[in-house]
Amino acid sequence: MKQCMDAENLHRRLRTIVGQVQAIDRMVDEDVPCEDVLAQIHAAKAALNKCGGVIMQGHIQHCIRDGLQHGDADRIIANFAKAVERFANMN
């Protein structure tokens, strides 16, 4: 998996998400208005979705391409379809 994605980019994004979630946790204790907490939750979810997109892009560009060139195309496509379905259902 490491070879098919920009790990540095992903780690940077994930650190940002960790910071967002920690901030949301603090907001709960600080009596921040619900609307503001919900806005931050939305931002964290969007950032996670972006991470999924980065992983999906790397998977297509490297793993799928390599698998189609050197493997069983039907199996590769079926596995990819399942991954896309799972990713699409995360929202």
Task: Pin down the residues of each PLM region.
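Solvent-exposed interaction patches of small proteins and small membrane subunits
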Residues: M1-N91
